[in-house]
């Protein structure tokens, strides 16, 4: 049979060039001169199959396996040998029909690589495949002159190895070794498990005590938590109720303040005006009295002078002289005419003054009506703004209550790394607000945090408190900074309707810019929908485009548009609240100003009416005096015409008399005017005095009311602060101490408490004291004891399994020993049956037998050989000659081969010590065995070469480099002859 199909070597020892030997016969001889490298085939085969002893490979180090170099050939960097076996009969422990084994070593590394059919493997895998085929170290598969001598000289225990390989019990030996090692490991594991088990028992006992204590602690702690949270929630709700009451009271008082403070200011302003006007009127009275005194003095002087003139005129009239009477009448007419002209001038002046006052009254009345209208409109606007503010506050409070992000922000003391919702950090250009809000969508309410760790803690808080879901924007961990591609931006900048990128129209802190870029960096702003469609098309519909009106063209081409109710957004809610408050402040200021203007106009209107009334009275008096003077003039003219029978010619009177009358008329008019003004001024003072008294009373009442309200407000605010502090402390305790939100605590711990507040506090103190007295608590022991018990059960199960495994392994060892003993003994018996035939053939007679050195222990017994060549009876093989020793060894070895055929046997000059006749017998035995065994024979002997099916020659045509080639018997004999001559 042919088992080894192919031998390939490169760089191994003297095989500098790659050589390949294909084996086609079952008996192949390798011949060549000494030093030609023919035995390197044996070394190569040993090396591939895992030989590690450099001595057995005839080398000192791994680098000696690699071609060292010669004069004509450089040293090789590596050595590799590959053996290909026919495994069609499944002789190897591998199902593949052909097995190729290769070993490679690199110069300087000292490490080998092993391959099976081109796949990198371990030496152990190769050893496993080639077990029990006789090619292992010390086995029968490789027989050299040295191994023949070794067989004879070896100790019985060492000699046993050949018989074990032949019997095939090596697999049992290895199996037993594995099982024994496994048993040893199992026993060791059992000891270790026993130690662990004992430790676990101690730990369990200790943990049981700790866990019992911990469970009592946890139960008491939970009861304390239940009671304390119930008390805290009750106090919170009670305090919240009181806080609401105080807030309502404060709101009511502040509302009254808003109403009464402007009224007080108005009253104080009016009082100041009244006082000032009263002082002005008082000063005016003094001035008028002084002026009136001077006028009276002037009138007295003028009347005295007129009286003198009148006496003179009357004296003339009383005279009988008609001429003098006529002259007197002329003078009287002239005087009265002068007085009439003066009175008529006064009438015209007064009429003009009345006209001016009437016009001014009309103007003031119009201004007053306008002011009233503005005041009404302002009041209506103020009411609307106040209602709008209440609505916005309600919206804000609703958002605060329902938004999980705000709940997190409220609990910043319990959580770190939270900042605020995104809307609080952004500012938009007004014209882009609608577009940007549309682009941001719900992300405007996302919660900004420092990093992922803060987000994870917040999410855990949300889960624990069952609050809801929040989307987080971690500043440090936003990894993407989206932008529009430069080539697309270049296109956009050339198109009409392109208003920029969303992120360009947002103001924010620099640290938040990556977030803004991530959300708006790829959002295009367009002027209108038509432009948006165009921009989307020119950028291949890769980006979202938003118009100033909020229409959207999404990436991919989806369009969204139409009427949308202008709802409040999270972004502008706070802005609108601030705007509403500013509007209310402005409207309140406007209302105060309008009321002040209204009071001033009403006062002015009253003054104008009084002046008008005064002027009308004065006009009436002037008209009466004009009528009286006209009648007097008419009477004088009639009398004059009766005396003269001619009409009055109107010749003017003397300058002095006329001027005197005019001065007197003016003085009387001034007196009357001053008297009227003085009377009006007195009436004004009386009116102002009443107004001042009334205003002072109202001011005092209102000031007293405000003082009372201030006191109430101080008390209410103190109460508010007190309950706010209580609520704050309770919230901090629940947030920080229990890691719960107030909402969750109210939902789960708002339970009736059967104890009074004092009793509950005392019970809490007692429970806390009990907890403190319990000392250190191992809370982990509760979970640990379950784990520890499980581990104990597992280890105990493992302990029992190991005990069972030990029994099973011991049983397996017994079974292995039994099988090995049986098969080994069968081999010994078969060899002893075959040995006499082989021995007689080689020796031509005599006897030979193998025996156990210890028949009671077949598996450990050595093997002794007893041989008696013809005519000799020896007790020790060492007494035989060298040739006899060789024949004895070969007799036993060939007998073994007949009984247990090996697939491959390598004979390395094993017959060198035999004479020609025995060489021939040696060769015949090999030839008879070649049907079941492939022989690779390295030989110098002609008798052996003649029996070989094929001869291969090994020669060094180039110094240091071995070449192999087929060779004839004649050529082989020439090699031998040359070798002998040398």
From Swiss-Prot:
Full protein name: Chromosome partition protein Smc
Designated gene of the protein: smc
Signal peptide residues on this chain, from the entry's feature table: none
SUPFAM superfamilies associated with the record: P-loop containing nucleoside triphosphate hydrolases, Smc hinge domain
InterPro entries named among the record's database cross-references: P-loop_NTPase, RecF/RecN/SMC_N, SMC, SMC_hinge, SMC_hinge_sf, SMC_prok
Record text about domains: Contains large globular domains required for ATP hydrolysis at each terminus and a third globular domain forming a flexible SMC hinge near the middle of the molecule. These domains are separated by coiled-coil structures.
The keyword Ribosomal protein is annotated on this UniProt entry: no
Species of the source: Mycoplasma pneumoniae (strain ATCC 29342 / M129 / Subtype 1) (Mycoplasmoides pneumoniae)
Annotated ranges, domain SMC hinge: 416-535
Coiled-coil intervals: 171-235, 263-377, 568-627, 669-713, 753-818
């Amino acid at each position: 049979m042919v088992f080894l199909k192919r031998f390939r070597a490169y760089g191994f020892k003297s095989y500098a060039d790659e050589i390949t030997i294909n084996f086609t016969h079952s008996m192949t001889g390798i011949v060549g001169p000494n030093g030609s490298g023919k035995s390197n085939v044996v070394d190569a085969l040993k090396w591939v199959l895992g030989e590690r002893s450099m001595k057995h490979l005839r080398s000192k180090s791994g680098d000696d396996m690699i071609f060292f170099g010669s004069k004509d050939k450089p040293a090789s960097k590596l050595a590799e040998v590959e053996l290909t076996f026919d495994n069609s009969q499944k002789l190897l422990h591998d199902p593949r029909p052909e097995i190729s084994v290769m070993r490679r070593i690199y110069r300087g590394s000292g490490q080998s690589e092993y391959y099976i059919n081109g796949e990198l493997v371990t030496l152990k895998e190769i050893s496993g495949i080639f077990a029990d085929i006789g090619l292992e170290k010390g086995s029968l598969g490789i027989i050299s002159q040295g191994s023949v001598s070794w067989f004879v000289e070896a100790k019985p225990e060492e000699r046993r190895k050949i018989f074990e390989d032949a019997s095939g019990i090596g697999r049992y030996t290895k199996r037993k070794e594995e099982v024994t090692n496994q048993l040893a490991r199992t026993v060791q594991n059992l000891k270790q498990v026993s130690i662990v088990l004992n430790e676990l028992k101690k730990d369990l006992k200790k943990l049981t005590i700790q866990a019992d204590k911990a469970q009592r602690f946890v139960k008491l702690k939970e009861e304390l938590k239940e009671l304390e949270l119930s008390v805290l929630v009750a106090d919170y709700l009670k305090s919240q109720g009181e806080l609401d009451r105080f807030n309502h009271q404060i709101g009511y008082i502040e509302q009254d303040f808003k109403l009464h403070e402007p009224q007080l200011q108005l009253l104080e302003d009016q009082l100041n005006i009244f006082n000032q006007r009263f002082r002005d009127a008082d000063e005016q009275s003094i001035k008028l009295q002084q002026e009136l005194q001077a006028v009276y003095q002037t009138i007295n002087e003028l009347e005295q002078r007129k009286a003198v003139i009148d006496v003179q005129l009357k004296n003339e009239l009383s005279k009988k002289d008609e001429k003098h009477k006529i002259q007197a009448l002329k003078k009287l007419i002239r005087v009265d005419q002068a007085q009439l002209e003066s009175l008529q001038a006064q009438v015209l002046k007064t009429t003009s003054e009345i006209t001016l006052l009437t016009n001014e009254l009309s103007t003031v009345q119009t201004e007053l009506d306008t002011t009233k209208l503005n005041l009404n409109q302002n009041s209506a606007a103020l009411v609307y703004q106040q209602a709008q503010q209440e609505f916005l506050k309600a919206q804000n409070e609703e958002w605060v209550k329902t938004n999980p992000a705000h709940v997190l922000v409220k609990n910043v003391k319990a959580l770190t790394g939270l900042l605020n919702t995104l809307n609080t950090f952004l500012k938009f250009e007004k014209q882009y607000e609608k577009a940007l809000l549309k682009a941001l969508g719900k992300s405007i309410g996302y919660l900004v945090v420092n990093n992922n760790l803060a987000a994870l803690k917040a999410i855990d808080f949300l889960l624990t408190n069952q609050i809801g879901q929040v989307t987080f924007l971690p500043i440090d961990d936003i990894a993407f900074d989206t932008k529009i591609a430069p080539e697309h931006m270049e296109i956009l900048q050339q198109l009409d309707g392109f208003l920029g990128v969303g992120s360009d129209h947002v103001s924010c802190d620099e640290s938040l810019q990556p977030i803004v870029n991530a959300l708006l960096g790829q959002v295009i702003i367009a002027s209108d929908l038509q432009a948006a469609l165009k921009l989307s098309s020119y950028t291949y519909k890769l980006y979202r485009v938003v118009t100033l009106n909020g229409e959207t063209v999404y990436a991919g081409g989806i369009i969204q548009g139409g009427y949308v109710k202008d709802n409040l957004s999270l972004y502008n809610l706070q802005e609108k609240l601030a705007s509403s408050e500013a509007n209310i402040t402005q409207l309140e200021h406007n209302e105060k100003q309008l009321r002040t203007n209204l009071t001033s106009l009403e006062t002015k209107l009253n003054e104008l009416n009084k002046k008008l009334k005064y002027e009308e009275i004065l006009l009436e008096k002037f008209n009466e005096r004009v009528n009286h003077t006209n009648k007097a003039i008419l009477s004088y003219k009639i009398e004059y015409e009766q005396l003269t029978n001619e009409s009055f010619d109107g010749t003017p009177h003397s300058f002095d008399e006329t001027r005197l009358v005019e001065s007197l008329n003016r003085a009387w008019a001034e007196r009357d005017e001053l008297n009227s003004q003085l009377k009006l001024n007195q009436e004004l003072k009386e009116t102002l005095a009443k107004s001042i008294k009334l205003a002072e009373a109202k001011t005092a009442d209102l000031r007293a009311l405000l003082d009372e309200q201030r006191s109430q407000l101080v008390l209410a605010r103190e109460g508010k602060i007190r309950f706010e502090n209580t609520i704050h402390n309770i919230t901090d305790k629940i947030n920080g101490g229990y890691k719960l939100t107030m909402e969750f605590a109210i939902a789960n711990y708002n339970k009736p408490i059967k104890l009074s507040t004092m009793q509950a506090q005392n019970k809490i103190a007692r429970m806390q004291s009990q907890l403190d007295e319990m000392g250190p608590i191992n809370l982990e022991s509760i979970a640990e004891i379950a784990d520890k018990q499980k581990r104990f059960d597992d280890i105990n199960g493992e302990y029992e399994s190991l005990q069972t495994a030990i029994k099973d392994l011991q049983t397996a060892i017994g079974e292995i020993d039994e099988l090995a003993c049986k098969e080994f003994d069968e081999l010994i018996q078969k060899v002893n049956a075959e040995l006499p035939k082989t021995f007689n053939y080689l020796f031509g007679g005599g006897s030979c037998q193998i025996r156990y050195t210890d028949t009671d222990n077949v598996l450990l017994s050595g093997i002794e050989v007893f041989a008696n060549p013809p005519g000799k009876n020896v007790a020790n093989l060492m007494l035989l000659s060298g040739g006899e020793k060789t024949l004895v060894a070969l007799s036993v070895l060939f007998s073994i081969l007949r009984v247990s055929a090996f697939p491959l046997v390598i004979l390395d000059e094993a017959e060198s010590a035999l004479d020609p006749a025995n060489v021939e017998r040696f060769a015949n035995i090999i030839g008879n065995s070649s049907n079941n065994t492939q022989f690779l024979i390295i030989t110098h002997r002609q008798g052996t070469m003649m029996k070989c099916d094929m001869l291969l020659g090994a020669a060094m045509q180039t110094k240091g480099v071995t070449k192999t080639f087929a060779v004839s018997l004649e050529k082989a004999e020439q090699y031998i002859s040359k070798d002998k001559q040398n």
